[in-house]
């Protein structure tokens, strides 16, 4: 240790996704938390601190094939936090450990951080970039309703629709008939 600098990192950021793609992903990750399907975090946090649970939480869960490791990554527009659950010898965890145990731990941790520094998670909301195109698409196809020709017969493809976000000006494509693509 003679004081010589061996290495100094120089940050050279590279944009990987467009703003539209990034904000669409944020919208998708909001559903991971709010749906409560893969994690009880939202329910646990609501029980512990209802006002903090109203923050704009997005997140991603993860589990290895044999349940040796489980993750929960959480974010608000202001702060990101990740938690891991597992054994150092790769023994499997109980089924549902990520859904319940890690989620509960993370809810208590988030609340403890909030108690130590009130307002740290912020009140900001994630929002879609103005370049995002919204399209009404069929639930069944993910494409816009339309007409297709099958064996010379024109068929109207319609049904229930949902809003779909696109990172292109054109938005969703119109339904087409292509059998055995690939």
How should these model regions be labeled?
Residues 1-61, 65:
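A conserved catalytic-loop motif detector
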Residues 7-11, 48-50, 56-182:
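Soluble, non-transmembrane domains of envelope/secretory-pathway proteins that act on or interact
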């Amino acid at each position: 240790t003679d004081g010589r600098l061996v290495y100094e990192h120089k940050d050279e950021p590279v944009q990987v996704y467009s703003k539209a793609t990034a904000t669409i992903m944020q919208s998708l990750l909001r559903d991971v938390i709010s749906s409560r399907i893969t994690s009880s975090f939202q329910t646990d946090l609501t029980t512990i601190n209802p006002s903090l649970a109203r923050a704009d939480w997005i997140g991603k869960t993860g589990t290895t094939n044999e349940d040796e490791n489980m993750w929960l990554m959480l974010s608000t527009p202001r702060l990101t936090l990740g938690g891991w659950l597992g054994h150092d010898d790769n023994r499997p965890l109980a089924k549902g450990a990520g859904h319940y145990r890690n989620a509960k731990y993370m809810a208590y941790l988030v609340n403890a951080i909030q108690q130590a520094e009130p307002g740290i998670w912020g009140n900001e909301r994630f929002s879609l970039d103005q370049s995002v195109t919204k399209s009404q698409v069929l639930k069944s196809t993910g494409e816009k309703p339309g007409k297709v020709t099958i064996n010379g017969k024109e068929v109207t493809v319609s049904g229930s629709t949902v809003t779909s976000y696109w990172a292109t000006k054109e938005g969703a494509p119109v339904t087409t008939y292509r059998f055995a693509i690939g």
